[in-house]
Design a protein with these regions (language model features):
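Class I S-adenosyl-L-methionine-dependent methyltransferase catalytic core
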Residues: 1-172
């Protein structure tokens, strides 16, 4: 759906790279705008269907929303730079460009904070199987409020940021 046709009425959460909405309790949550640059479906190696069907096709580096549009933003970008062209992990999680991922993620953080309201919450998820989370956090000047490691070998990081009011004042 084009951004100009999408109503934000009742929408309080932006998932800026939703993929197949894997961690969502309700994959059709009416409070959320599900955005991704991909819209595709695949049959995985075990026969399961993988469907990436966002409400809005948009790149997380150039979100089509006004500043301060959402009180909650979810940012779970692709975390793999080494994955085969037909590999199931690339289909499921997306793929980073080896040359540009730092700039893309830096811009993604900036966009997340731009569309986030003052005192809003950014939920950031990263799996450091290939790229250490320390390299990712260095791409934003914002400081996390909460940081939790989960998953196999504690490689998945859930990092919560709270946007300060001063960030909005700087943008004005």
């Amino acid at each position: 759906m084009p951004a100009n046709e999408l109503s934000l009425e009742g929408k309080s959460i932006l998932d800026m790279c939703c993929g197949s909405r894997m961690f969502w309790f309700d994959k059709e949550d009416e409070r959320a705008v599900f955005s991704d640059k991909r819209s595709e479906s695949h049959t995985l190696c075990d026969g399961r269907k993988l469907v990436i069907s966002p409400d809005l096709i948009a790149d997380f580096t150039a979100l089509p929303f006004a500043d301060g549009s959402f009180p909650v933003v979810v940012f779970d970008p692709p975390h793999l730079e080494r994955v085969g062209p037909n590999g199931w992990q690339g289909k499921k999680y997306g793929k980073l460009d080896r040359e540009t991922w730092r700039d893309e993620l830096r811009t993604g953080f900036a966009e997340a904070f731009r569309v986030l309201r003052p005192h809003g919450v950014l939920i950031f998820k990263w799996n450091e199987t290939q790229i250490p989370v320390s390299q990712i956090i260095a791409l934003t000047d914002e400081n996390p409020a909460i940081w939790q490691r989960t998953g196999k070998n504690d490689k998945t990081h859930w990092i919560i940021f709270v946007k300060g009011a001063e960030a909005q004042e700087k943008a004005l």
